[in-house]
Amino acid sequence: MMRKISPAFLGAVIGVAATLTATQPALWSERSQAFGAATEGYRQLNLFGLVFERVRGQYVDKAEPGKLVQFAIDGMLSGLDPHSVYMDAKGFRNLLVDTRGEFGGIGIEVTMEEGLLRVVAPIDETPAAKAGIMSNDIITHLDNEPVQGLTLEQAVDKMRGRVNSKIKLKVRRKGEEEPFQVSITRDLIHVRSVRFHLEDDDVGYIRITQFSQPTTDELKKAIKDLTVQSGDKLRGFVIDLRNNPGGLLDQAISVSDAFLEKGEIVSVRGRKPENIQRFSAQRGDFTKNKPLVVLINGGSASASEIVAGALQDHRRATVIGTRSFGKGSVQSVIPLGQANGALRLTTARYFTPSGHSIQAKGISPDIEVLQDVPDQFKAGTDRIGEASLRGHLKAERDEQAGSQSYIPPDQKDDKALHTAFHVIRNMQKSSGYLPQGDLGGPPPNSIAGPR
């Protein structure tokens, strides 16, 4: 439970501040800007206290003080950007469970938009993915209860539950005339973040589904196992980050580091000019400089974009697919005490090694490959992106709305993947990067221009 704020206490604080301001003009002269900001802050808190007291005393039904404070906090944060949220103690515990990669639920990454849940991406091989939930779907009801009025954390909590229990989702999909209902059986979501196989004995395919605590260790094991399986035939690796919604910043950095010998991976810049952190690669490319292709699409967000941007800027990998989601902000988790939960607050923007912010723009691929999307999926898998989220942080320059997020369920229909295998087999080993337009043959699709 949040600690309740006493309006009387707020009033006392305001009174003291006003007295100090009125009786010490010299100090005001010296520190007018600081005091001005503080006084304005106190005035706004006093306004909050007045409204709080009126609502508590005069609302038609009895209003619980704790809920009023919760509503106020939720409103304050939702007005900042789509990714800043308050988590109560239970929500904070759930977040810690998420980063370990195991929880009971249905397996989707969601964000809140205009009071409804928007699917960023379903996690591979989870109940949601198997039930046909797609990126860009809008969830309006959970077990017949409207999502409108719930916080993001409350909605996520409702989707979790005992293994083998069921939940009904009412879904709105662009292109469908009517909403439809899906019943999903919850399962233990043990998110193995890395999957891999050897393609035709000479290309290592590695899919990273999210960035959780075990991701880098799982990646290195995949590289080692594929190298052993192939003998001396391995030509290179395809790293598939499509529909990967992101995750932990430190894992994005260490995954990038696994493929780089040196150089900056990402810089994180806060509000003040001095609040800049730079993260650089350590010596030792875990693949021994094997050629790389990175696959991205409109569902590749956040940590995925850090990896794709770093490898692209250093010309370590050729990036293939469609423009990424465009989430270029960093959220810090700020604990508020054991009983009070935590804030997940946007505290910085991140920049690729070349100094580009991808906020509301995304990473543009070196080779753009558009999938053949079945008619029933066309409307629901196109034009998603950070720039389409209400209240998003604005881009430094022109914003881009997003791109395709469809991945064909059958590998034989996956044009981006086939292009990646073709590129690897024709890539210059010395650079690990295919010069733009050089596919060793006719390009199977269009070549993207410079970012």
Where are these regions (language model features)?
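C-terminal "post-core" interaction segments
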Residues: 4-8, 12-15, 19-23, 30, ...
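N-terminal activation segment of mature serine protease catalytic domains
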Residues: 35-84
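PDZ/PDZ-like domain micro-motif
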Residues: 43, 124-137, 192-195
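Conserved PDZ fold ligand-binding element
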Residues: 52, 128-151, 240
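PDZ/PDZ-like peptide-tail recognition elements
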Residues: 71, 83-121
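Short flexible coil/turn linkers enriched for glycine and charged/polar residues
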Residues: 100-104, 112-116, 133-134, 161-165, ...
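PDZ-domain C-terminal substructure recognizer with occasional recognition of PDZ-binding tails
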Residues: 115-118, 140, 154-195, 346-347
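PDZ domains, with a preference for the canonical peptide-binding region formed by the helix
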Residues: 138-170, 251, 327-334
